[in-house]
A protein has these predicted regions:
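Generic hydrophobic, aliphatic-rich segments that mediate packing or membrane embedding
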Residues: 49, 69-71, 143, 231, ...
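Elongated alpha-helical scaffolds
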Residues: 68, 221-223, 227-244
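Short acidic-glycine loop/turn motifs at beta-strand connectors
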Residues: 69, 77-79, 239-241, 249-251
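Predominantly extracellular/luminal cell-surface or secreted proteins
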Residues: 75-78, 125-129, 166-170, 247, ...
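Active-site-adjacent structural elements in enzyme catalytic domains
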Residues: 230-231, 240, 251-252, 261-264, ...
Length: 415
């Protein structure tokens, strides 16, 4: 019999009389023996079909496996359960009593005030229900549901603002309710478990669109594929043709991934008294002489304002703001509208400990890509087939990358 072990130093022919290749085989007492079987890595299961696995070890020794399925995004920590870290696409507040139950069924119709953007099969978490609806308990409603249909059963034209879920208990009466503080947090659109080859018959729900028209194939109605990498201890995941998401390992497996545009790009302590308010206005001007690098529409969180300025309280200034205009000449500054009551005088202040924390934003950061990778040496996150700066359409030939060691900084700079 051939000697135990594999001999691959030469070609298959030069290894004649030895074992050259094997699969799931070990050598025991000089003889080849197949493995005895498989054991489950984790006792629990995940939802959907896994299309991407990525494992890594943190500096602290934690062993993780990232799992991207056609339905969700998970992370597993050293044989523990799979933690659902699927990003939230949007969170909407419902109008008063917009949850409708029908006697004898577990199907509940929920209406949003604006378009929800969901597709059949998506997951949504309902919170804030303060009373039973048709006999369905509060705890049964305040949980994560899978959307089974869009629209109202009696009006299929309401697909953009209504959706249906199946609760774990049936209603004992027909009623509408929920209260005035109900929110619906929609996870990112789910994808298909199969490849769609064309845009013809059967690619959209029954009755969708006009007769004979084709249906566009996007990330929600095509085979769901992921690319997953680790950025140091953290994980970055990209839905093919979709957004790029970031999961921060330091916050734990109970926190979901967020869009790359929502991570912190820069946090800086500003010079003394950087905040100016104008009499009879809610517009504030904040000086960041170090150069903010922001554009209109970006968000910044201000903290550390020590007292009221021009009649506007510190609590109204120490908030997240949306930038309304920018001035890039020195000293650089930006403005934001904080709403509420106007300032009673023009004044400058804030103290010496004001901090501005900028999010990466959607202008420079890619919001759609085909794939992401990372350069191991300089640690650039590289987006392949992504949107251009300031745009939304995917350019299959465009390759962009972030600054070294800075996954939230994508602004191209001259060197």
């Amino acid at each position: 019999a051939p000697k135990p072990g594999l001999f691959t130093d030469g070609t298959r022919y030069s290894a004649e009389g030895t074992w050259y290749d094997s699969d799931k085989v070990r050598f025991r007492k000089g003889f080849a023996e197949k493995i005895g079987g498989w054991t489950k890595y984790v006792s629990n299961t995940y939802l959907g079909t896994a299309r991407k696995l990525h494992d890594w070890v943190t500096d602290g020794g934690n062993k993780y496996v990232g799992v991207g399925t056609n339905l969700k995004l998970y992370v597993n920590l050293t044989d523990a359960d799979y933690s659902d870290i699927t990003p939230i696409r949007t969170t909407l507040t419902l109008a008063t009593d917009k949850i409708t139950a029908v006697n004898g069924t577990a199907v509940v119709t929920i209406e949003t005030a604006t378009a929800h953007g969901a597709v059949k099969g998506d997951y949504v978490t309902i919170a804030g229900v303060d009373a039973t609806v048709g006999g369905i308990a509060i705890a049964v409603l305040n949980t994560t549901h899978r959307i089974v249909a869009l629209g109202d059963p009696s009006d299929e034209t309401t697909t953009s603002t209504k959706f249906r879920v199946v609760c774990s208990a049936k209603a004992s009466s027909s009623a509408s309710g929920g209260g005035s503080s109900v929110t619906a947090a929609f996870q990112i659109n789910t994808g298909l478990n199969e490849y769609v080859t064309s845009t013809g018959w059967g690619t959209d729900p029954w009755g969708q669109g006009t007769w004979g028209s084709s249906a566009g194939i996007g990330q929600a109605n095509q085979l769901r594929l992921w690319s997953i990498i680790n950025f140091g201890d953290d994980m970055i995941a990209n839905v093919r043709q979709g957004n790029i998401y970031y999961w921060d390992e330091s916050v734990g497996t109970g926190t979901v991934a967020v869009a790359l545009s929502d991570i912190t790009r820069r946090a800086v302590t500003l010079t003394a008294n950087p905040v100016t308010v104008t009499n009879a206005s809610t517009i504030v001007t904040i000086v960041d002489k170090y150069g903010h690098g922001a554009v209109v529409g970006d968000t910044v969180t201000i903290s550390g304002v020590s007292g009221a300025i021009g009649g506007i309280s510190a609590a109204r200034l120490n908030v997240e703001m949306t930038i309304a205009s920018v001035i890039n000449t020195q000293p650089a500054s930006f403005t934001a509208d904080i709403d509420g009551s106007d300032a009673t005088s023009t004044a400058t202040g804030g103290g010496s400990s004001v901090v501005a924390t900028y999010k990466a934003g959607t202008y420079h950061t890619p919001i759609a890509a085909h794939q992401v990778m990372m350069s191991d040496v300089a640690r650039h996150v590289i987006a392949f087939g992504c949107n251009d700066v300031g745009g939304t359409a995917i350019n299959p030939l465009l390759v962009r990358w972030c600054s070294s060691e800075a996954p939230g900084t994508w602004e191209p700079l001259s060197t």
